[in-house]
C-alpha cells in the first residue's frame, strides 16, 4: 500500500496481459476502491496472512478466505487470481482439507503453495507421496523454465522449503518449471489453464526470489493493476464509516498506540464531533503515558478525550488470577463494563470503535473448521483483548475500519492522516498493558516495580538511537525471586527478563542482537534504581516457537 499507484511497480515495466476468465464481474465491496483482488484460500497455514501481506506489497488487494468458501461466493468476489496456501496436513490423509474440484474450471489463474500445490496435483490426477527425504529450511532452486512465473528470478536463488511430502507424478498437461537437489518437482505449471504450483514458500523473507515470483503471478499472469493504495483506502474507509454510522455517536477506546490513534484520526475526519475518545487508565500503562496522551490529543490534535481512572476496578477484578487467558478476558470484559457505565454519563452512544487488526483476528483463531474434528484448522495461539474478551451482552455495535490491515499498513495510513512520527513509529503495546508482563498473580506493587524497570529500558533504548530498530523492546517481571548481594547485604528479589524482537508484521519474529553495552547499561540501572529487582536476564526466543509476549 503506497500513496499513489504506478505502472512502474511492474517487473521491468512490462504491460500485464489480459487473462480471459469464466468469472463474471464481482459486485462485492472491497476496501480501498480496489477493483481487483487476489484471493488466498487458507488451508490452515500460519503463513496464509503473510501471503496476503506480500500480495498487498505489490499494491494489489488480497483477502484470506476459508478453503471451504463456496464456488458461488468465489464467482461473486471475482478475484483476478487465487493462491492456495500451505497447511499442516498431507493431501492423501482421509480428512485432509479439500477444495471444490470446480475451482480448477473457473478459468482464474491459480498458484498453489506447498500443500496447495500438492492438492492441485492430487485433484487433477497426479500423485503425491511421503518424500524420501523431508526438506526444511533454505534450498537452492534450479529453474528449468525461466519464463512466465520465473521471469527475472535468478537461477540458483534461495527459496524456503518446509515439507515432508512431494509430487511423485505431475497431472496430464503440466510441465516442470524448477527443482532443487532434494525435490524433483519444486515448481510446475499448466500454462494454457493458468495453473501453477510451487513446493516452496515464496512469501517468507528467506525466499530471496519470492517477491519477484509473486509479482510475476500478480501482474503478468493475473493481469492485476497496482491500485491498492493508502489514499484510496482512507477515502473508502471514510465513506464506509459514514455509511454505517450515519449521524450516530461513536465511542473509541484510546490507548495512545498507533492503532487507536490512527483510528481516532480516521474517525474524526469521517464523523467529526460525533466521535468521543475515552482513555481508560486501567493502572497498567507505562510511566507518564496517561498524562502525556491526554494532553497531546486535547491540546495538539484538538480531539476531545474523556479520562477515566479505573485502576482500582481492574486490580480488584484480577485479584487471585494468574492464568494469562483469564487475565486477558477479564481485562477485556472490564474494559467494556467501564465503557458501558461511562457511556451512560457521556452518551448516549451507538457504536464502539476498535483498532482490531488482521493479525488480532488471526491469532485469536482462524475461521477454518477441520471436517473431522470440528476444530479450527489454524490453532488458537492466544486471545486478544479486543477479540476474545468481549462479553456476550455487548451493548454497542462495533465499527472496525482497520480490521483488514496489517500493522505496517496502519502506520502508512496514520502517516497519511498527519499522525506524528512519535506515534506512527511507536512500538506495539498490548491492550492489557503491563498486566500481561507481570507473570502470575497481579499486585499493585509488582506493577509499580515493572513500570519503573520498563521506563529505564525505554529511556536507554531511546538514548541509544535504536528504538526503531526493534519491533518491540520491553521488560517482563518473572514470578520468581533470586538471591543476590548488594554491598554487604544479601538480597532476595524478583528476576526481570528483557525482550527485544525484530519483525515485519508480528506474525513471526526473531530475537534482536542487542549491543552488549546497551544491555549492560539497562541491567545496571535497573538493579541499582528499582527496588525489588536484583537480577536481569535476556529472552532469546524467536516466534515461533515462542510468542512475542510471555502471556
Swiss-Prot record:
It is an enzyme of class 6 (ligase). GO terms for molecular function: ATP binding; GMP synthase activity. It catalyses: XMP + L-glutamine + ATP + H2O = GMP + L-glutamate + AMP + diphosphate + 2 H(+). Transmembrane segments: none annotated. Residues 37-227 form the Glutamine amidotransferase type-1 domain. Keywords: ATP-binding, Glutamine amidotransferase, GMP biosynthesis, Ligase, Nucleotide-binding, Purine biosynthesis. Its EC number is 6.3.5.2. Residues 19-28 have a biased composition (Polar residues). GO terms for biological process: GMP biosynthetic process. GO terms for cellular component: cytosol. Homodimer. NCBIfam families: guaA_Cterm, guaA_Nterm, PRK00074.1. This is GMP synthase [glutamine-hydrolyzing]. It comes from Gloeobacter violaceus (strain ATCC 29082 / PCC 7421).
Amino acid at each position: 500500500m503506497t500513496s499513489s499507484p504506478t505502472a512502474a511497480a511492474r517487473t521491468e515495466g512490462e504491460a500485464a496481459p489480459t487473462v480471459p476468465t469464466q468469472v463474471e464481474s464481482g459486485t462485492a465491496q472491497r476496501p480501498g476502491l480496489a477493483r481487483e483482488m487476489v484471493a488466498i484460500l487458507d488451508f490452515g497455514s500460519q503463513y496464509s496472512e503473510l501471503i496476503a501481506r506480500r500480495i498487498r506489497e505489490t499494491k494489489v488487494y488480497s483477502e484470506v478466505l476459508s478453503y471451504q468458501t463456496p464456488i458461488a461466493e468465489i464467482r461473486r468476489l471475482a478475484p483476478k487470481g487465487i493462491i492456495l496456501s500451505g497447511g499442516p496436513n498431507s493431501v492423501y490423509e482421509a480428512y485432509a482439507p479439500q477444495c471444490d474440484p470446480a475451482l480448477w474450471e473457473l478459468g482464474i489463474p491459480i498458484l498453489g503453495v506447498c500443500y496447495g500445490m500438492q492438492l492441485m496435483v492430487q485433484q487433477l490426477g497426479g500423485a503425491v507421496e511421503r518424500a524420501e527425504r523431508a526438506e526444511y529450511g533454505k534450498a537452492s532452486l534450479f529453474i528449468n523454465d525461466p519464463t512466465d512465473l520465473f521471469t527475472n528470478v535468478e537461477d540458483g536463488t534461495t527459496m524456503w522449503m518446509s515439507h515432508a511430502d512431494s509430487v511423485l507424478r505431475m497431472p496430464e498437461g503440466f510441465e516442470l518449471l524448477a527443482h532443487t537437489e532434494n525435490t524433483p518437482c519444486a515448481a510446475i505449471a499448466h500454462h494454457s489453464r493458468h495453473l501453477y504450483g510451487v513446493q516452496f514458500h515464496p512469501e517468507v523473507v528467506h525466499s530471496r526470489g519470492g517477491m519477484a515470483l509473486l509479482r510475476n503471478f500478480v501482474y503478468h499472469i493475473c493481469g492485476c493493476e497496482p491500485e491498492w493504495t493508502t489514499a484510496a483506502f482512507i477515502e473508502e474507509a471514510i465513506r464506509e464509516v459514514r455509511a454505517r454510522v450515519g449521524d450516530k455517536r461513536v465511542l473509541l477506546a484510546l490507548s495512545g498506540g498507533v492503532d487507536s490513534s490512527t483510528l481516532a484520526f480516521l474517525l474524526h475526519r469521517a464523523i467529526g464531533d460525533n466521535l468521543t475518545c475515552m482513555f481508560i487508565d486501567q493502572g497498567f500503562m507505562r510511566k507518564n503515558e496517561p498524562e502525556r496522551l491526554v494532553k497531546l490529543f486535547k491540546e495538539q490534535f484538538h480531539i476531545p478525550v474523556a479520562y477515566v481512572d479505573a485502576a482500582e476496578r481492574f486490580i480488584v477484578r484480577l485479584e487471585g488470577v494468574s492464568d494469562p487467558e483469564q487475565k486477558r478476558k477479564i481485562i477485556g470484559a472490564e474494559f467494556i463494563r467501564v465503557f458501558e457505565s461511562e457511556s451512560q454519563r457521556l452518551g448516549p452512544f451507538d457504536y464502539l470503535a476498535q483498532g482490531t487488526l488482521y493479525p488480532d483476528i488471526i491469532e485469536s483463531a482462524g475461521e477454518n473448521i477441520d471436517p473431522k474434528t470440528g476444530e479450527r484448522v489454524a490453532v488458537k495461539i492466544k486471545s486478544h483483548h479486543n477479540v476474545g474478551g468481549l462479553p456476550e451482552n455487548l451493548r454497542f455495535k462495533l465499527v472496525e475500519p482497520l480490521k483488514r490491515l496489517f500493522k505496517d499498513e496502519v502506520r502508512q495510513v496514520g502517516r497519511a492522516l498527519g499522525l506524528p512520527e512519535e506515534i506512527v513509529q511507536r512500538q506495539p503495546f498490548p491492550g492489557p498493558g503491563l498486566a500481561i508482563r507481570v507473570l502470575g498473580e497481579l499486585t499493585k506493587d509488582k506493577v509499580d516495580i515493572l513500570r519503573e524497570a520498563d521506563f529505564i529500558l525505554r529511556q536507554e533504548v531511546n538514548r541509544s538511537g535504536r528504538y526503531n530498530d526493534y519491533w518491540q523492546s520491553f521488560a517482563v517481571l518473572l514470578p520468581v525471586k533470586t538471591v543476590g548481594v548488594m554491598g554487604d547485604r544479601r538480597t532476595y528479589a524478583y528476576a526481570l527478563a528483557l525482550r527485544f524482537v525484530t519483525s515485519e508484521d508480528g506474525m513471526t519474529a526473531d530475537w534482536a542482537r542487542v549491543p552488549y553495552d546497551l544491555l549492560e547499561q539497562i541491567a545496571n540501572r535497573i538493579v541499582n534504581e528499582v527496588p525489588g529487582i536484583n537480577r536481569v536476564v535476556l529472552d532469546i526466543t524467536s516466534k515461533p516457537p515462542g510468542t512475542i509476549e510471555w502471556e
